Amino acid sequence: MKKLISILITVLLLTATASAAGNKTDSTKGVLPMKLNIQIDNGTSKHELTASLYDNSSSKALAELLQKAPVTIDMHDYGNFEKVGFLPATLPRNDKQITTEPGDIILYLGNQITFYYNTNSWNFTRLGKIEGVTQAELKKILGEGDVTAVLSVEK
C-alpha cells in the first residue's frame, strides 16, 4: 500500500511539474499588434526599417512610451556587432541568457536599446526583430560610425 501511495504521489508531482513547465512564457512568443518604425540616419544616407515587437512587458512599455511621441536616440557602435543608445526611460527587464541574431532589437540594463547586426551572447531582453533586411544590408544601413535612430509605433 505504501508503495502504491508513493507511486501515485510521484505521478502527481511529475504531472504538476510538467504542467508548470508548459505555462512558462518565452519573451519571443507572440508579437504585439503594432509595428515599430525605425528611421536611421547614418550620416551619409537615411533608411526606414520596420520591426515586429515581441509580446512581453518590456516591449509593451516601449510601445506605450512611443505612443506618446517618437523618440530620437543617438547610437554608437559597440564591439563591431551592435549599435547601442540610451532610452529616455527605464523599461521593465525580462533578461534571459540568449544569443542574438542580426536584426534583433534588445533591451540592455533596462535603459539602453541595441540593434544587432551580428551575434552576441549575454543576459538580455528581446524587444523585437527588424524585418525584411539581410545581415549585410543591415550592416550597411547602420554603417561603421554613430547613427541617429527615430523610433515610433503604428497600430
Segments predicted by a language model, with ranges:
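Bacterial N-terminal signal peptides
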Residues: 7-16
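N-terminal secretory signal peptides
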Residues: 33-81
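Glycine-rich active-site loops that engage anionic ligands at enzyme catalytic sites
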Residues: 70-155
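Sec-dependent signal peptide cleavage junction
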Residues: 17-29
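Extracytoplasmic
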Residues: 31-35, 46-48, 57, 101, ...
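Positively charged n-region of N-terminal signal peptides that target proteins for export
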Residues: 1-4
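Sterically constrained small-residue positions within well-ordered secondary structures
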Residues: 11, 27-29, 106, 140
